């Protein structure tokens, strides 16, 4: 079981659950180990996760876990199954209620429920468990309450690694196949909403810089490519960009995935291309002048939920550098 080390409360709860299961003799001879890992984005990538379990930094391998797994050796590849806890959370319900019950929820191709995280410019952000097939419009407006008063929803970013969803696509069912059909992805079910007061160039820059910072630098095309795209987006945001910079971003987005070990640079490609294709007019508005919607748009990195149920964001992430250090360690600890 792998958890980020900063999640102390969650780590302690899992440890307590393990002790309770052992005391009740529910584990048997199956060894269960808890591994705490770094805060890096790539800790969630399955090949990098195996490296962390073996005591190494979260650097993705070239071979998937089902071919070479934990503690592999030349004579024993040790294929390993890596599952998200949300997947495993369905198992006891299926065992208790049966597969037919499970398939009665959701859609034929994507049965069951999913935890969907909704944040950004909505009245009621939160984490909601909903049946697969629920539309994005129902999530944003029916459950999330829509945009703040006087505003309209402009775009939705499905996490940090997929095509931006425009309002015309909000009726798409939230299932893996349906989201893929419109050129996006359901991913981990995280949706960041931006209303018409937000600048798409600046939002794209925030996500692009996040991917640049979190790139492990094993693949030069990824590290240099995400860095160049982020630099060009920042130039455009300052009002110093031009059509040439947009064309360069599009060209670089085609090569950033060369020899990739993981899907991180694919996320850069999808976000950059969709932002320019769908919101190209906003890029043009920046040519020769500063951002016409000068609103701060930080990376929406959620670290907790407060006593009122509101998300708590990592305010120090702005200090994180591409080598995974922080620009000002004193600020980080105060």
Predicted regions located by residue number:
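Small-residue-enriched alpha-helical segments and adjacent helix-cap loops
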Residues: 1-43, 48, 151-171, 176-177, ...
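Generic beta-strand/beta-sheet core signal
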Residues: 2-4, 35, 119-121, 130-131, ...
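Hydrophobic alpha-helical positions that pack around
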Residues: 11-132, 322, 327-329
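Local cysteine-cluster metal-coordination motifs and their immediate loop/turn environment
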Residues: 41, 154-163, 184, 209-231, ...
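Gly/Pro-rich active-site capping loops and adjacent beta-alpha segments
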Residues: 59, 64-92, 176, 182-215, ...
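Intrinsic disorder at enzyme termini
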Residues: 64-65, 74-75, 81-87, 152, ...
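Short amphipathic, charge-patterned alpha-helical segments
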Residues: 132-148
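Immediate flanking context of iron-sulfur cluster ligation sites
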Residues: 145-155, 197-218, 235-264, 281-289, ...
């Amino acid at each position: 079981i792998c958890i980020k080390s900063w999640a102390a409360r969650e780590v302690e709860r899992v440890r307590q659950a393990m002790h309770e299961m052992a005391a009740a003799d529910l584990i048997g001879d199956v060894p269960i180990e808890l591994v705490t890992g770094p805060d890096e984005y790539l800790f969630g990538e399955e090949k990098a996760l195996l490296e962390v379990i073996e005591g190494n930094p979260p650097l993705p391998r070239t071979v998937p876990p089902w071919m070479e797994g934990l503690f592999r050796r030349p004579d024993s590849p040790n294929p390993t199954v890596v599952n998200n806890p949300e997947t495993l959370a369905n198992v006891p319900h299926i065992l208790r209620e049966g597969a037919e019950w499970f398939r009665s929820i959701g859609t034929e191709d994507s049965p069951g429920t999913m935890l969907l995280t909704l944040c950004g410019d909505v009245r009621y952000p939160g984490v909601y468990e909903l049946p697969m097939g629920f539309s994005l419009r129902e999530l944003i407006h029916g459950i999330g309450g829509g945009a703040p008063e006087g505003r309209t929803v402009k775009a939705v970013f499905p996490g940090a690694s997929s095509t931006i969803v425009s309002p015309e696509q909000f009726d798409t069912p939230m299932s893996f196949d349906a989201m893929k059909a419109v050129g996006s992805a359901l991913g981990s079910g995280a949706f960041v909403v931006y209303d018409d007061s937000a600048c798409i160039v600046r939002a794209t820059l925030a996500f692009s810089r996040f991917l640049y910072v979190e790139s492990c630098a094993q693949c030069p095309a990824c590290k240099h490519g995400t860095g160049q795209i982020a630099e060009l987006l920042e130039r455009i945001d300052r009002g110093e960009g031009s059509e040439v910079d947009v064309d360069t971003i599009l060209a670089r987005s085609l090569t950033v995935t060369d020899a990739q070990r993981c899907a991180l640079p694919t996320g850069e490609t999808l976000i950059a291309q969709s932002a320019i294709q769908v919101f190209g007019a906003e890029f043009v508005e920046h040519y020769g002048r500063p951002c016409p919607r000068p609103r701060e748009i930080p990376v929406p990195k959620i670290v907790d939920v407060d006593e009122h149920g509101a998300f708590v964001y990592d305010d120090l992430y702005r200090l994180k550098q591409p080598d995974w250090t922080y620009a000002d360690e004193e600020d980080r600890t105060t």
